[in-house]
Each structure stands twice: as C-alpha cells, then as structure tokens.
Amino acid sequence: MIPRLTDAERAALVDLLPEWSLAKDRDAIERRFAFADFSEAFAFMTRVALLAEKHDHHPEWSNVYNRVTILLSTHDAGGLSARDIRLAEAIDGLA
C-alpha cells in the first residue's frame, strides 16, 4: 500500500504548492484554473491527461466553460500521498 502523507508533509504543502489548497471535505488537494475560453481550458485538460498517463496517476476534475477544477488524492493510500504532490508539481509546470 502507498503511504499517506504525514502531518509534517501536509504542513509543508503550503510552501511547496502555494496555488493548491487542502480540500474541505476529504483528504485531497485541489486547484482551480481559469482560461480565456473553453478551447484553452480543454487544451489544458488534454495536456494534463497525457501527463497523468505518464505518472500513472489520474485526477478527479471538472470543467465548466473556461474553468477547470482539479482534485488529487490517492485511492490506494486512502488520502494524500507523494504521488499527488508529484502530479500537482507537474501540473503546475503546464499552467
């Protein structure tokens, strides 16, 4: 089983991933993105999908017109893990 993040690792997320926040209702991190239009939002989602495949770790997400919300959590760990951090950092590189 994949280990969950420790309390110290969670506390470090504020500095490590300043654009992400802890989800209110579950053990996950989330980030909201806004783009000029739907085409840009969908293009971003396509790039994230390819990245997620490379990481073998897939986000939960939603899209409404020019907005994309991404939520990361590791089901095998029952919450946040290092896999979520690595994918969030990679997604930040695309934004």
Curated annotation (Swiss-Prot):
It catalyses: (4aS,6R)-4a-hydroxy-L-erythro-5,6,7,8-tetrahydrobiopterin = (6R)-L-erythro-6,7-dihydrobiopterin + H2O. CDD domains: PCD_DCoH_subfamily_b. Keywords: Lyase. InterPro entries: PCD_sf, Pterin_deHydtase. Its EC number is 4.2.1.96. Gene3D superfamilies: Transcriptional coactivator/pterin dehydratase. GO terms for molecular function: 4-alpha-hydroxytetrahydrobiopterin dehydratase activity. GO terms for biological process: tetrahydrobiopterin biosynthetic process. Pfam families: Pterin_4a. It is an enzyme of class 4 (lyase). It comes from the Bacteria. PANTHER family: PTERIN-4-ALPHA-CARBINOLAMINE DEHYDRATASE. Belongs to the pterin-4-alpha-carbinolamine dehydratase family. This is Putative pterin-4-alpha-carbinolamine dehydratase. It comes from Acidiphilium cryptum (strain JF-5).
